[in-house]
Amino acid sequence: MGKNLLQQRAGKGSPTFRSPSWLRIGKVRYPNIFGHLVGKVIDIVHNPGMNTPVAIIKLENGTKFLTQAIQGLVINQKIEFGKGSPIANGNVIEIGDAPEGTIVCNVEENFGDGGKYARSAGSYAVVVGKSGDKVLIKLPSDKIKAVSNKARATVGVVAGGGVVEKPLLKAGANYWKYKVKAKKWPIVRGVAMNVVDHPHGGGLHQSVSRPSTVSRNAPPGRKVGHIAARRTGRKEGK
């Protein structure tokens, strides 16, 4: 009898395939606080599963929150949070107060969502215009996005931009990179497996050895390859 496919095991939802959220130090998002407050960076730490350093900020009312550290941020640095904050590196501002050309990161779409855009290492967005109660920002993908003028953003560029340039050097480093996010690695081709493990496995050489097209109504253990394909291969002519 054959074994379950990888996607069947993942769909069951065992701990092997679940993201280890218990390793995280907390949610990295803005607190839902109104008004203007002054805070201090009390520490810069690593959050497992993230490629950006995380700053722990304590506001004058005692609230602590986690946010992406930006380039140039240091421990014990004073930052300002909320409406009316000056446009200075590390401050959390209402994006409606930012003039055109301001570089921001960790941008909310609407007030209170905690931050949605330009959050990864080395990324930033640029304020390019304003229209009514919306502010237009240019994302790292060069797409123009309209966000609420009440949305909050951090002035500056997210730290850790060189993380993709650092070589992994060995497979063990790549293993742990995927392990902390519960992503399956390495990905093994079906034709490289034994016949008991996959419908494309087995044989004296690596070949599907049977039609790779499969019915839409095929059972889960058979549903691999070209699913309900109208056609396969290159088009002839033209």
UniProtKB/Swiss-Prot annotation:
In this chain, composition skew of type Basic residues spans: 223-238
Q: Which SUPFAM superfamilies does the record associate with it?
A: Nucleic acid-binding proteins, Translation proteins SH3-like domain
Note whether Iron-sulfur occurs among the keywords. Answer: no
| Superkingdom as given in the UniProt entry | Archaea
One molecular function GO term is:
rRNA binding
What is one Pfam family matched by this protein?
A: Ribosomal_L2
Sorted alphabetically, which keywords does the UniProt record give?
Ribonucleoprotein, Ribosomal protein, RNA-binding, rRNA-binding
The record's Gene Ontology biological-process terms are:
cytoplasmic translation
GO CC annotations, alphabetized: cytosolic large ribosomal subunit
**Segments of this protein annotated with the region Disordered:** 200-238
State where composition is biased (Polar residues): 206-216
Q: Which InterPro entries match?
A: NA-bd_OB-fold, Rib_uL2_dom2, Ribosomal_uL2, Ribosomal_uL2_arc_euk, Ribosomal_uL2_C, Ribosomal_uL2_dom3, Ribosomal_uL2_RNA-bd_dom, Translation_prot_SH3-like_sf
Per its UniProt record, what PANTHER family does this chain match? Answer: LARGE RIBOSOMAL SUBUNIT PROTEIN UL2, RIBOSOMAL PROTEIN L2
Subunit structure, as described in the record: Part of the 50S ribosomal subunit. Forms a bridge to the 30S subunit in the 70S ribosome.
| Function summary | One of the primary rRNA binding proteins. Required for association of the 30S and 50S subunits to form the 70S ribosome, for tRNA binding and peptide bond formation. It has been suggested to have peptidyltransferase activity; this is somewhat controversial. Makes several contacts with the 16S rRNA in the 70S ribosome.
Q: Provide the family line.
A: Belongs to the universal ribosomal protein uL2 family.
- What this protein is called in its record is Large ribosomal subunit protein uL2
Species this chain originates from: Saccharolobus islandicus (strain Y.N.15.51 / Yellowstone #2)
Gene from which the chain derives = rpl2
